[in-house]
């Protein structure tokens, strides 16, 4: 649609010999071209033009019979606006015979006149030849004179210096241009920039567009600042202050609470449920208004049933610190008052039982008792030997849910105990607090669902009438982790998604936008609520740590060691002819250790900086919380065992990782260990010294040593160890949980290699106690059975050898020992025993030699490797007496007064081990210690904020030394210091080293936070304010950029950007060699041709593997990748295809028009609701009035209007270019249609 003020430019373009068809689609019914309506001013000398004036009716335009009307001269269909300008300021004067309609406005009347140009008089000192033309022709057919310079020709010649001759000459007064504009086309908002709105093209509305690939000659494209505008705008509009809309009871929450703008746009269902909670609780504010709202909607949802007959559940997605615990206590209290006196409450730690009791007590439910499940003996909970517990709350951890008694019996599992206590018709409350712990029910790749997830699902299926509540700030960082939330009714019988897999495919295929819709839909149905504390006052900062020269040298030495190790692993595996399955296991362990090793180096580089910052903050009157994920206790215990219980120095965790890998997983079989495991007496055979026996001696197959593994697992078990009960039963349950989780993680890692979800730093050490893949796994036999067994079944031996990859070529080597094979087998085997013996014996010795060489290299490097981060931090910050440690480990290495190093237990005489973390927390909150170090074990439920009720009210500075590997744990850690009822909001400091690979971990967290904010809070922008989104590479743009990078390095594609200019050497050659060293580029053995790894465009794998490259290489490669990614994103934005998620339309100068609305009824749940689909059109851009004002003020030689070279929708686009910096040739341009202001 054309603004009334467009007539000025159209007239000028027409006079210049340019057809308006170049600008507009004349056939469009929506485009009405305005007639130029100049009003003659007193300042115009009448002698300048010999004008013939004739009065005519306003509705008609007088034309010569033979004249073809120009589009610029079409009559206006509406009352024209008034435009005033000086005629002689048009540089290109009209040709003879041109007819111009003039409108002259007086206070009384408006008259229209037709001006026919009969004569041209030059008034300037420079004479200009007159142009004679008998009639006006269409601009498309008229051949202009030499003096008429056409804009089209100038642009075709790419000559910006030839200015479009529409600019006023410098010796003439500036033109005056006014035009009335109509802004009635829809609501126009002025709050935000137009750059947020995506292009929406509607078929019935023809809109003019600016070609995204248009290039202005001689204008160097700079990085466009509009990206920053978008981000700032997104931050400003991400949250809306929250107050319950449809529930008017309760007092205001003590702290400001917000909701994402996406969720706030959806209203929850009407409230019809009446709560039974006492007025005293409500009036005293023991439950705030928003907590009462959650209780009411949960109880209301519990009154409905899903199509499959199960009672509907409710999901509380409130952020950390809002008060989910008190809300859950309120739901239990509400049901208790209605006669449902039994409830089950699951959480992640037994420590949180005390918080549950506190929450119930605080809301006035003192008579509801809380019992720990792991304190009960196996058997009926209501029996006498369990205290005849028949009502109250049973508090259990997820690990105890899968606990099992070894003694047997009818109720030998905790799950059966619970099911019996509840009963088949149980309609009480089951709460899954911190329910992200039940994730991974839906397996990825070849992994298996976790036992925890299966148990949670079974409990819900066995109790269909139970009132289920899911509660977690991180309920589902990915939709795949929602598999256990089957009570939400999103999938299943009677819903659009028959199976959960159907739901997953639909959501994941559509990306983050679909997850936002899922959250909004759940709120609309009344099954979901998500609020979080306002982040006002919270500061976020990313502190990049510089690396010292000594550190870089140590790092590069480590890289060379790992490159050498990779070659040795490959050579040794080929020497012993290992099977493919065993190779896969070997490489899985190798790359897992590779990632852990360099992760520990990355963390170690930041210790000095953290200590420095911590000391500064303490001096400034603040207190410090340092977040870690791994404690490295397993390596400490291994070193302690090797040293006979004594230590000479702090243990190097990195060294322990590499040493454990070589000793347990290097493919160099130990034949003595093999035969001892198989029960074969080698000494009895040694006297024969027969060649046919020798091949068997080099075979090494492993089985699990039951006693040893059990002992090591108990030693190394850390997470949850301090949270468990002192009873034997709870200990065994905790062990079972750890083994179950870690076994699943291990299998998942082996199946997917470098999957981002794999946690290489989990506290359980069972991964390092995994069986050597070169040894078979064998069930534990009792000692008595071993003594009785005189012979070995040859089939079992052969299968064991086959499992190790050693039995296929030498199947008969055990014939003399076993004595049960046939004579024909003996004969066939003896025919080639000599050659087989020589080859295999030599291979094993060479493999053993390689193993020894690697261990020797490690010892040389070990002097430079950093010590355990946690021990070093505590030592540097003043020792255990000054630092409150809240981790899962049981002991630590300390520096004594005499300078010696020793290992000591964390337990204290007056503090039971099960409440050690709670005691340390209290010391921190009381101000006895001003520094706290928390690990994952303390990341759930523990409150460390500057609480008004605590003695220590210093401002918290939360330093994240080690970014959690998943968003679940990141949110939990961030929420420890930002909670309700705090005096001051915390400061967050994220320490990231300048190592390129280090940003890999920030990338994963950023990805998870983005997805997390989208799903659990309905808006992906909810997590952008955490200042980590700039490290998010794992998206479609990142994968596209990585594909371009990898292909350009192996010369399969041309580079999109130039390599870093400061790289010393041949960038592509050096980086190619580095990527070969980390396995991302393969070299064919025979041809030497370079091929890319099958997962070459996997962002996680790429950023993980480049950790193993030298510092300058990985930094340069990462810079090259980042530059390519920026180019990819810029192209996507210019093409209008950049995914910006849910956005607000009409927030700037856009004109939004509603074209159509369709309503759809939403099936799958009983509550009424519908979905509305709006079809709208959005028009954006600068008005012609604004454009002409800017045009009038131009002074630069290259300023003016330009046309795009490319045609889109059969139209060209005009842009206004203004010179900003003549020296740098920096220009400001405005796309008239899209309104993009760029430099």
From Swiss-Prot:
Q: Where is this region: Disordered?
A: 684-837
Can you name this protein? Answer: Protein strawberry notch homolog 1
Q: Where is the composition biased (Basic residues)?
A: 778-790
Q: Which GO terms describe its molecular function?
A: chromatin DNA binding; histone binding
| Protein encoded by which gene | SBNO1
Q: Name one GO biological process term.
A: negative regulation of canonical NF-kappaB signal transduction
List, alphabetically, the GO terms of the cellular component aspect: nucleus
Q: Which residues form a coiled coil?
A: 838-866
UniProt lists compositionally biased (Basic and acidic residues) regions at: 694-713
Q: Which Pfam families match?
A: AAA_34, Helicase_C_4, SBNO
Family per record:
Belongs to the SBNO family.
- Stretches of Low complexity bias are at 814-837
Function of the protein: Plays a crucial role in the regulation of neural stem cells (NSCs) proliferation. Enhances the phosphorylation of GSK3B through the PI3K-Akt signaling pathway, thereby upregulating the Wnt/beta-catenin signaling pathway and promoting the proliferation of NSCs.
């Amino acid at each position: 649609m054309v603004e009334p003020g467009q007539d000025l430019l159209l007239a000028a373009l027409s006079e210049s010999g340019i057809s308006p068809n170049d600008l507009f689609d004349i056939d469009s019914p929506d485009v009405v071209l305005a007639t130029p309506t100049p009003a003659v001013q007193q300042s115009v000398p009448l002698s300048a033009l010999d004008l013939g004036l004739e009065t005519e009716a306003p509705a008609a335009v007088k034309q010569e019979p033979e004249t073809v009307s120009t589009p610029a001269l079409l009559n206006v269909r509406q009352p024209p606006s008034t435009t005033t300008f000086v005629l002689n300021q048009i540089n290109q004067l009209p040709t003879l015979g041109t007819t111009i309609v003039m409108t002259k406005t007086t206070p009384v009347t408006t008259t229209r006149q037709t001006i026919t140009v009969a004569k041209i008089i030059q008034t300037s000192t420079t004479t200009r030849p007159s142009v004679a033309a008998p009639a006006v022709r269409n601009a498309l057919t008229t051949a202009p004179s030499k003096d008429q310079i056409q804009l089209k020709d100038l642009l075709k010649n790419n000559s910006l210096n030839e200015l479009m001759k529409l600019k006023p000459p410098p010796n003439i007064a500036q033109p005056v241009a006014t035009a009335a504009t109509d802004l009635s086309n829809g609501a126009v908002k002025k709050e935000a920039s137009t750059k947020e709105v995506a292009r929406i093209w509607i078929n019935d509305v023809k809109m003019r567009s600016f070609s995204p690939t248009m290039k202005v000659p001689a204008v160097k494209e700079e990085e466009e600042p509009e990206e920053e505008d978008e981000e700032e705008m997104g931050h400003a509009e991400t949250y809306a202050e929250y107050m319950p809309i449809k529930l008017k009871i309760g007092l205001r929450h003590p702290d400001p609470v917000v909701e994402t703008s996406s969720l706030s746009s959806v209203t929850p269902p009407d409230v019809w449920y009446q709560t039974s909670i006492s007025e005293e609780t409500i009036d005293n504010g023991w439950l705030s208004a928003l907590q009462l709202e959650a209780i009411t909607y949960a109880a209301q949802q519990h009154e409905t049933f899903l199509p499959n007959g199960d009672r509907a559940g409710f999901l509380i997605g409130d952020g950390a610190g809002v008060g989910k615990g008190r809300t859950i206590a309120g739901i239990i209290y509400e049901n208790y008052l209605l006669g449902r006196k039994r409830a089950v409450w699951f959480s992640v730690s037994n420590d949180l039982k005390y918080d549950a009791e506190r929450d119930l007590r605080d809301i006035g439910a003192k008579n509801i008792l809380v019992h720990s499940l792991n304190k009960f003996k196996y058997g009926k909970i209501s029996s006498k030997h369990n205290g005849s517990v028949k009502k109250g709350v049973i508090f259990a951890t997820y690990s105890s849910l899968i606990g099992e008694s070894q003694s047997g019996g009818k109720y030998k599992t905790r799950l059966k105990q619970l099911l019996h206590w509840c009963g088949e018709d149980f309609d009480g409350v089951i709460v899954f607090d911190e329910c992200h712990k039940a994730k991974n029910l839906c397996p990825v790749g070849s992994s298996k669902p976790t036992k925890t997830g299966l148990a949670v699902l079974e409990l819900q299926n066995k109790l269909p009438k139970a009132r289920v509540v899911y509660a977690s700030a991180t309920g589902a960082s990915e939709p795949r982790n929602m598999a256990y939330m089957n009570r939400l009714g999103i999938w299943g019988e009677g819903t659009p998604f028959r199976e959960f897999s159907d739901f997953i495919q639909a959501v994941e295929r559509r990306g983050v936008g679909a997850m936002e819709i899922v959250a909004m839909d759940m709120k609309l149905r009344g099954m979901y609520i998500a609020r979080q504390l306002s982040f006002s006052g919270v500061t976020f900062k990313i502190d990049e740590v510089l690396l010292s020269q000594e550190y870089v040298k140590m790092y590069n030495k480590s890289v060379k060691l790992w490159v050498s190790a990779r070659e040795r692993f490959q050579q040794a595996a080929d020497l012993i002819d290992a099977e493919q399955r065993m190779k896969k296991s070997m490489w899985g362990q190798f790359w897992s250790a590779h990632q852990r090793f360099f992760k520990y180096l990355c963390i170690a580089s930041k210790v000095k900086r953290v200590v420095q910052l911590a000391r500064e903050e303490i001096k400034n009157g603040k207190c410090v919380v340092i977040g870690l994920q791994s404690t490295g206790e397993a390596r400490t215990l291994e070193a302690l065992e090797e040293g006979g219980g004594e230590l000479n120095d702090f243990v190097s965790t990195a060294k322990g990782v590499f040493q454990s890998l070589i000793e347990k997983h290097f493919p160099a079989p130990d034949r003595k260990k093999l035969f001892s495991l198989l029960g074969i007496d080698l000494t009895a055979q040694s006297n024969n010294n027969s060649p046919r026996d020798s091949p068997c001696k080099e075979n090494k197959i492993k089985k699990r040593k039951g006693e040893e593994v059990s002992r090591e697992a108990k030693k190394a078990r850390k997470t949850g160890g301090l949270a468990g009960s002192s009873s034997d039963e709870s200990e065994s349950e905790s062990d079972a949980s750890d083994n179950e989780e870690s076994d699943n993680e291990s299998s998942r890692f082996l199946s997917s290699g470098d999957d981002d979800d794999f946690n290489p730093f989990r506290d359980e050490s069972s991964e390092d106690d995994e069986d050597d893949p070169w040894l078979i796994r064998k069930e534990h036999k009792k000692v008595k059975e071993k003594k009785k067994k005189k012979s070995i079944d040859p089939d079992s031996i052969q299968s064991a050898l086959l499992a190790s990859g050693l039995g296929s070529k030498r199947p008969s080597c055990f014939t003399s020992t076993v004595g049960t094979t046939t004579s024909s087998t003996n004969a066939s085997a003896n025919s080639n025993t000599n050659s087989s013996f020589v080859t295999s014996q030599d291979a094993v010795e060479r493999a053993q030699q390689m193993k020894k060489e690697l261990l020797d290299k490690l010892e040389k490097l070990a002097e430079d490797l950093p010590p355990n981060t946690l021990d070093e931090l505590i030592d540097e910050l003043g020792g255990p007496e000054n630092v409150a440690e809240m981790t899962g480990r049981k002991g630590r290495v300390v520096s004594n007064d005499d300078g010696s190093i020793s290992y000591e237990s964390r337990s204290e005489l007056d503090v039971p081990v099960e409440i050690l973390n709670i005691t340390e927390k209290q010391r921190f909150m009381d101000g006895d210690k001003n520094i706290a170090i928390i690990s994952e074990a303390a990341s759930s439920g523990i409150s460390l904020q500057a609480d008004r009720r605590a003695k220590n009210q210093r401002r918290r500075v939360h330093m994240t030394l080690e970014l959690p590997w998943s968003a679940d744990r990141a949110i939990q850690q961030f929420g420890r210091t930002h909670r309700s009822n705090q005096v001051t909001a915390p400061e967050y400091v994220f320490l990231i080293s300048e190592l390129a690979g280090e940003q890999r971990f920030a990338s994963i967290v950023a990805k998870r936070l983005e997805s997390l904010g989208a799903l659990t809070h309905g808006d992906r922008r909810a997590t952008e304010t955490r200042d980590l989104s700039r490290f998010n590479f794992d998206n479609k743009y990142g994968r596209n950029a990585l594909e371009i990078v990898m292909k350009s390095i192996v010369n399969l594609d041309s580079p999109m950007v130039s390599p870093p200019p400061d790289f010393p050497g041949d960038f592509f050659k050096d980086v190619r060699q580095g990527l070969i060293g980390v396995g991302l580029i393969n070299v064919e053995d025979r041809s030497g041709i370079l091929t890319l790894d099958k997962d070459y465009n996997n962002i996680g794998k790429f950023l993980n593997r480049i950790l193993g490259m030298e510092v300058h290489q990985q930094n340069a490669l990462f810079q090259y990748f980042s530059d390519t990614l920026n180019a990819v994103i810029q192209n996507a934005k210019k093409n209008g295809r950049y995914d910006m998620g849910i956005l607000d339309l009409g927030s700037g100068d856009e004109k939004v028009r509603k074209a159509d609305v369709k309503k759809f009824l939403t099936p799958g749940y009983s509550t009424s609701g519908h979905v509305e689909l709006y079809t709208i059109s959005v028009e954006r851009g600068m008005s012609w009035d604004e454009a002409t004002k800017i045009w009038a003020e131009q002074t630069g030689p290259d300023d003016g209007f330009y046309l795009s070279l490319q045609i889109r929708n059969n139209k060209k686009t005009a842009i206004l270019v203004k010179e900003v910096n003549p020296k740098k040739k920096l220009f400001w341009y405005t796309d008239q249609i899209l309104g993009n202001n760029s430099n």
